[in-house]
Amino acid sequence: MPRKGHIAKRDVLPDPLYNSKVVTKLINSIMLDGKKGVAQKICYDAFEIIAEKSGKDAMEVFETAMNNIMPLLEVKARRIGGATYQVPIEVRPERRQTLGIRWMLIAARKRGERSMRERLAGELLDASNNTGAAVKKREDTHKMAEANKAFAHYRY
């Protein structure tokens, strides 16, 4: 913890093409070894594939997919009297977005298509239709929280 007050959170700049901070966060998460240009190309190419396959606006599909992936609840381990309980907690908006992007990329990287842009496009299209591995991860997280609802009174 800092001794001198609160540290200001750095804000990301909106991306040049769609003017969206969420897309910038997606690009930053795709990026490996500081190669932002490559990450941008992957992201924008995936958006083009989405527009081509779905016939809808890529940004619209992306937003729908993100809403279908972002979790509302999660469980957090809490140790009480020698026993560890999985306590369900609400997810803050910032963390919801981060988890959504993280789960989407993990699911996309595990897919079978040839290039990352095809995998990302496929996962986003699946997520916008409420299918796919990232949506399953969200459902599993919600089921876990629902199953442990009895321990909600141990909340932080």
Swiss-Prot record:
Entries under InterPro entries matching the protein: Ribosomal_uS7, Ribosomal_uS7_bac/org-type, Ribosomal_uS7_CS, Ribosomal_uS7_dom, Ribosomal_uS7_dom_sf
UniProt GO molecular function: rRNA binding; structural constituent of ribosome; tRNA binding
Protein's GO biological process: translation
Cellular-component GO terms for this entry: small ribosomal subunit
Record key words, sorted: Ribonucleoprotein, Ribosomal protein, RNA-binding, rRNA-binding, tRNA-binding
Domain of life assignment: Bacteria
SUPFAM superfamilies: Ribosomal protein S7
Protein function: One of the primary rRNA binding proteins, it binds directly to 16S rRNA where it nucleates assembly of the head domain of the 30S subunit. Is located at the subunit interface close to the decoding center, probably blocks exit of the E-site tRNA.
Quaternary structure note: Part of the 30S ribosomal subunit. Contacts proteins S9 and S11.
Similarity remark: Belongs to the universal ribosomal protein uS7 family.
Protein name: Small ribosomal subunit protein uS7
Organism (species): Clostridium botulinum (strain 657 / Type Ba4)
